[in-house]
């Protein structure tokens, strides 16, 4: 059985400012660095052999902290990037026009054909995230990889593993530095192939998440 750990990056300056990131980038806050150290401490005893990350700065920094705790190298994989948010990238949520907010809500509410102009669809995101996950099956026997990616991207991936449409990802709450795990197995009791072991675990964190504070 192959176990693959999934970690969302730590809190960023734009998370705190409610600015849309997508494939644009902003650095981790001091709290985001702290979150990364906490999740690194939690997984440091799990025998992680590979830390594979989106090539965006916020994920690479989170991955670096985890890799140092686990004694691994960091492997960059652009397929693990966040959903491209098109014309809404770098925009403050509170500054959106009614039309722009409608585009954003189509994504948040899980609309099958939701796509922000000049952006990426959930189906396209799901396809590249599944490709990245399937690549883990090519690692040497006994490997235990950890993937560092983004909230929408990981939610989309977990949704497809569950057999749900890619756009169902907004039904999953994956907070900054939450820990999830998917396993690939052959089992007489569960579906063969990929299964979800856990999703969105934050028991290692010691402060409320931004979405709790910003309600």
Curated annotation (Swiss-Prot):
Pathway: Carbohydrate degradation; glycolysis; pyruvate from D-glyceraldehyde 3-phosphate: step 3/5
Organism: Serratia proteamaculans (strain 568)
Site (Transition state stabilizer): 150
Catalysis: reaction(s): (2R)-2-phosphoglycerate = (2R)-3-phosphoglycerate
Residues that, per the record, bind substrate: 8-15, 21-22, 58, 60, 82-85, 151-152
Active site: 9, 82
Keyword Isomerase recorded: yes
Biological-process GO terms, alphabetical: glycolytic process
NCBIfam families reported in the protein's UniProt record: PRK03482.1
EC number of this enzyme: 5.4.2.-
InterPro entries for the chain: His_Pase_superF_clade-1 (IPR013078), His_PPase_superfam (IPR029033), PG/BPGM_mutase_AS (IPR001345), PGM_Phosphatase (IPR050275), Phosphoglycerate_mutase_GpmB (IPR023086)
GO function terms (MF aspect): phosphatase activity; phosphoglycerate mutase activity
Gene3D superfamilies according to UniProt: Phosphoglycerate mutase-like
Top-tier EC class: isomerase
Protein family: Belongs to the phosphoglycerate mutase family. GpmB subfamily.
GO cellular component, one term: cytoplasm
Listed name of the protein: Probable phosphoglycerate mutase GpmB
């Amino acid at each position: 059985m192959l176990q693959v750990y999934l970690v969302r990056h730590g809190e960023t300056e734009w998370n705190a400012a409610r600015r849309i990131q997508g494939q644009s980038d902003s650095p981790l806050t001091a709290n985001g660095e702290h979150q990364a150290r906490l999740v690194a401490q939690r997984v440091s005893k799990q025998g992680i052999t590979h830390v594979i990350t989106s090539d965006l700065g916020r994920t690479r920094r989170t991955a670096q902290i985890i890799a140092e705790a686990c004694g691994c190298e960091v492997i960059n994989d652009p397929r693990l990037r966040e959903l491209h948010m098109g014309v809404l990238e770098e925009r403050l949520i509170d500054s959106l026009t009614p039309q722009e907010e409608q585009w954003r809500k189509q994504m948040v509410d899980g609309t099958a054909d939701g796509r922000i102009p000049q952006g990426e669809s959930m189906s396209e995101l799901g396809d590249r995230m599944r490709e990245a996950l399937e690549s883990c099956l090519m690692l040497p026997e006994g490997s235990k990889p950890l993937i560092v990616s983004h909230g929408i991207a990981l939610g989309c991936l977990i949704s497809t593993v569950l057999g749900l449409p890619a756009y169902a990802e907004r039904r999953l709450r994956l907070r900054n530095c939450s820990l999830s795990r998917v396993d690939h197995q052959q089992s007489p009791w569960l579906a063969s192939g990929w299964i979800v072991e856990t999703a969105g675990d934050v028991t290692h964190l010691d402060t409320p998440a931004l979405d709790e504070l910003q309600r």
